[in-house]
């Protein structure tokens, strides 16, 4: 006999442990029997689970975690993820999530090339947008703590007041509809220049028609600083409200508050961008040419008699 209990941010006591909603970090499983307490921060938890009759499943090798060294890494199928704080390296416990899809087709910067203006990653909106007088440079790409990134410089004296927009998808690449909630996330750091003569960075979600015409826009400021990229993951969720003409959504990193006649020179690092049809961000899902889905995590105890459960007495 196998029971099914949803995870609500705490560990249920028996049955199949599955997630329904935001990511859960599970640190202990108790309330079963004194000799069945499970420590999900232990390095040997996977062996302990197997020895006690539990089966962990997650199809596919697209799930990621932050390891004990602070490096973002992919994890093999059917392998429990023990996650860590990317800044303090503290163990957060077992990471259990529902299924999720990264709709950004290229989050690993495939096809990007340094230069002025250089080449943005394949399937990104190209070129980057800014008011007249603003130029762009792809400074380079690389990997930092397992996070694939691109460095983009925006500089010059604008002749109009507007935002600088770096679109991480084409105008029609992600099909969407009004009423849907989408969440964009990305690691962002300042690596050159400053935000002088701007109001700082931001994340945005731009609504367009199925043919790519502008419909509506929403964005939020983010406080971007210099330093290590790890720990600088920002998110923005928005319910699309453009009406019947909305047919696509475009995730963007912004430089906000650029004003006419005031020069700017800023270089930002963008890493591991993600776009999900959810109200919240889940763990990063790498992509290179197409949207990718991470399957749900599930922990099952097939024989509840092993924890003293007698179905005849229930």
Question: Across the structure, where does each feature detected by a protein language model lie?
Answer:
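Extracellular and organelle-lumenal recognition/adhesion modules and their flexible linkers in secreted
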Residues: 2-314
């Amino acid at each position: 006999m196998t029971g099914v209990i949803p995870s609500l941010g705490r560990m249920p006591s028996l049955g199949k442990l599955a997630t329904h909603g935001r990511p859960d970090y599970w640190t202990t499983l108790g309330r079963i029997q004194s000799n069945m307490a499970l420590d999900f921060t232990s390095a040997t938890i996977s062996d302990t689970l197997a020895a006690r009759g539990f089966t962990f499943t997650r199809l596919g090798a697209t799930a990621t975690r932050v390891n004990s060294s602070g490096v973002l890494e992919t994890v093999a199928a059917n392998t429990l993820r023990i996650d860590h704080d990317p800044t303090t390296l503290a163990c957060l416990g077992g990471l259990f999530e529902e299924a999720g899809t990264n709709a950004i087709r290229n989050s690993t910067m495939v096809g990007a090339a340094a230069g002025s203006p250089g080449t943005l990653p394949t399937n990104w909106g190209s070129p980057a947008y800014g008011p007249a007088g603003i130029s762009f440079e792809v400074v380079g790409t690389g990997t930092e703590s397992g996070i694939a990134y691109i460095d983009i410089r925006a500089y010059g004296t604008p002749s109009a007041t507007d935002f600088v927009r770096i679109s991480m998808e084409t105008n029609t690449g992600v099909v969407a509809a009004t009423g849907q909630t989408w969440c964009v996330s990305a690691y962002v750091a300042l690596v050159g220049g400053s935000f002088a003569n701007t109001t700082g960075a931001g994340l945005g979600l731009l609504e367009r028609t199925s043919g790519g015409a502008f419909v509506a826009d929403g964005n939020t400021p983010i406080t971007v600083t210099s330093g290590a990229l790890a720990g600088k993951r920002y998110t923005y969720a928005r319910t699309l409200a453009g009406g019947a003409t909305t047919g696509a959504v475009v995730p963007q990193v912004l430089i906000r508050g650029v004003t006419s006649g005031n020069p700017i020179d800023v270089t930002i690092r963008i890493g591991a961008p993600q776009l999900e049809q959810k109200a919240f961000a889940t763990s990063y899902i790498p992509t290179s040419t197409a949207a990718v889905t991470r399957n749900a995590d599930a922990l099952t105890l097939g024989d509840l008699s092993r924890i003293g459960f007698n179905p005849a007495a229930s």
